[in-house]
Structures are given as structure tokens and as C-alpha cells.
Amino acid sequence: TATGGSVATAHPGAQSIPTELRKNILACIMHTMEQTEDFCDSDFGIERLAEKAGTNSRYTSVVINNVFGKNFRSLLNEYRIKEAMRRLMDDDTYGKLTIKAISESVGYKSQANFITVFTRITGIKPSMYQKLSREEKEKKINA
């Protein structure tokens, strides 16, 4: 309101975005995050995701918040960590890489930030995850 009260239209919900457009934005988000590794680019941001969806970052943000119940940064971190977990388990392809190199390969500019986010999402540090994955693989080979 003009008196400083909250205005529901200041940050429109998904209802203010036409249904077809909402569906298209969601389809593009899902395609980009599930079928490409674009999110592993350290400069990947909501603007680039919105551009791929043919819309603006505000609409993209609203769809992410409404569908996933989280903000873009949280969604991006989850996909990056999921990919890091895959890479930490893939000794054949990534086994010679350091944790720092893997963190950079999934888009983190700071190894410390990567370790913090990885630990928050998985409950263990990346080095421990890699060690446990290798031990599990050894058990299967020796079984």
C-alpha cells in the first residue's frame, strides 16, 4: 500500500504468471538441470537459466520458489552437489582429481564454500564421501 504496508503484488506468486508460460519455464528448468551440465559453469546464474527459458529472472525465481519450495541458489547447490557426488564416486573418470578440482568442475570458485555446502547437504565432508565410496567399491570387487 501507499502507506508502507506489504503489497502482495510486489513479488507476484506463480498465479500471476500465465499457466502455459509457467509450464514452459518449469520444463526448461528441468531440462537444463537434469539433461545438461550447464549448472557446472561457475558463472551459471538465474539470468542464464531465465534466458534459456525465454523469460526473465523474476518469473524464473517465482517458478523455482513455488515448485521446489526453495530459492535458485539452494536449487543450484543441490544439483552441483549431486553432480559432485557422482564425480567423487566415479574413480575411472575423476579418481585422479583433487577435491578442489572436483569442486571447480561443478562450478564452485571456492573449495571452502564447496566443502561447507557439500557437508550441509550430505552430512559428511567430500573427502569422507569419496573414501566411503571407494571402500564400498572395494567390497563389491572383493565379494
Where are these regions (language model features)?
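Binding-interface segments
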Residues: 114
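Membrane-proximal linker segments that couple transmembrane helices to downstream signaling/catalytic modules
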Residues: 1-105, 117-120, 127-128, 132-143
